[in-house]
Amino acid sequence: MSAKNATLILHGMGSPNVTKPIIMLEECGLDYELRHVAVFGQEQFTPAFLALNPLGKVPVLEDPQLGAPLAESGAILFWLAEREGKFLPVQNPARQDVMQWLMVQMSSIGPMLGQLTHFSLLSPPGCEPYASARYRAIAERLYRLLDDRLQAREWIAGGDYSLADMAIQPWAYYLERHGFDASAHPALVRWRDRIAARPAVQRALARADETFTEAANATRRAASNEDLDRFFSRTETVPAADFSAVKMM
C-alpha cells in the first residue's frame, strides 16, 4: 500500500527477514513507509538506530498502537496478525501449528540458511571448509523437511495461508543459490512459486526493490573492509567479498 500519510514505519534492508513483514503489511492492505537502513555504512550502530533496537538489527517496526518500536521479524509478523485479525488461526490446534512453524523458521531455517550463505558465498578464499560443509548438511535436511511436508498439504501449517508461509517463503529462494536441485524439491518449489504469484507478494517485492536495492548497492560499494568486518562480525580483516553471487532480498 501507499506510504502517503502512513503511520506504520518499517526500517530495513534487502533481506528475507525484512521481506517477511513487508509481505504481511501488503497482505493486510496497510499503509506503511519503508525506510532503508544503511547497514553496510554502519547506520545500525548509530545512537538513533540503537534507540529503536539495541541489538542493532533490522527489521524494526514503528506502530503507534504499540507505543514502542518492535524488532525481530517473527514478533512483527505475530503482532500484525494479532492487530489485524488475519493470517493466524484463532482456535487450536491450527493456531499452535502455525506458531510452531513460525518458530521453526525463526530458530532453524533462517539462522541455518543464513550461516550457509555466509560460509559458502561470502567467506574469504582459503576459509576452513568445515563450517560450509556443516551448514550445507543442515540446509539439505531443512529443505527436505519442507518439501516432504508440502507434498501432503497446500500450506505450511494450520490448513490455510498464514504467517508461517510468509515467514518461510522468502528463504525458499535460496534453494538454488545454495546449489540444491529444484527438481528434487518439487513440492517446495511449487509452494514457493504459488506464493510469489500472489498480488500482495508481488507488491511487497516491488516495494522492497524500489526502496532498498540501489541504496544498498551504493553503501556496499562505499563500504571499507573494516565496515564489512563489523557487519559480518568477522574477527580479522579480509578482502571485501564479491557480492555478485548473493541477491539481497
Summary of predicted features, one role per range:
Residues 51, 197, 206:
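Phosphate-coordinating loops and pocket residues in cytosolic domains that bind phosphorylated ligands
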Residues 10-12, 167-170, 206:
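Short beta-strand segments
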Residues 174, 191, 204-205, 212:
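Polyanion-binding and phosphate-handling cores
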Residues 108-199, 247-249:
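GST-like fold's C-terminal all-alpha helical module
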Residues 208-249:
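Acidic/histidine-enriched, glycine/proline-rich intrinsically disordered or flexible terminal extensions
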Residues 1-133, 147, 235, 239-249:
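GST-like domain detector, emphasizing the conserved glutathione-binding G-site
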Residues 39-40, 190, 210:
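Positions that flank functional sites
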